[in-house]
Amino acid sequence: MSENILNQDSIEQTSLDFVKSNLHKEACFGLSDQQFNQLKTWSKSAKLNTHSTKFPDIVFDNGFIEHFGVTSSSEDKKGAHQVRESSIFKKNSETRFLNNLETSEQDELVSNSYLRPFEQHSHINIVESIKKNWVKHIGSYEKSMNSSEHRIFLLQYLDTNIHTAITPKNECAEIFESYMISADKSLLKWIYTFKEKIDYLILINPVSISLEVIKISSIPALIEKEIEVIYTPIFGFESHRFHGMKSSK
């Protein structure tokens, strides 16, 4: 099995474990108590597909969970710009530190810090990312001719750069340190058009410990709620710190 497949399996298993550990009724929208308990049962029994390269990623009795990542940074054919540049930055930082360590005096403590600003993030980017990847995985579902009765898309928000402020009518605003899809009425209307193909949407962000579950057929009732929503990009820096000492052999 290739390293890429092993890495992907690890990501999918970690995402599934996050759902199992953090699934609670307050994070579910449009689900009855019975449907919530059913979802818990499915998640507990779910396993990675033994055919790693085939649809779907995760299976359970008469059902599937298909996992994919979404981003609020810009994307191109190579994927999310933030993820790619972060990987390059980390690798280059490690290389520079090791070079400095190699040229240092014996038993001299070497400490290096490397800093770069985050890429630009936006609400538009994450909506486009969700739509693009959703359509792609709908295509995989249709090609697979999968006949499962229970169908779930598991989206993983890969960044922490969009925060959400939700203000219900006549109430104070609540701030969430992640993108909250349950308040994105325009996108939910679009997702609702796939109600005959996918039953549940789960959006997770393990970094901000955020999880939302939406029963897609219940979306019309969700978007009737009178709320005001603001999605705000968060600006910051990515940093790496290294400490080491070249000792005598």
Regions found by a protein language model. Give the residues of each.
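Conserved catalytic cores of phosphodiester-cleaving nucleases, focusing on short active-site segments
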Residues: 58, 63-69
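Metal-dependent nuclease catalytic core centered on acidic motifs
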Residues: 1-51, 68-249
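Aromatic-lined ligand-binding clefts that engage carbohydrates, nucleic acids, or primary amines
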Residues: 54-55
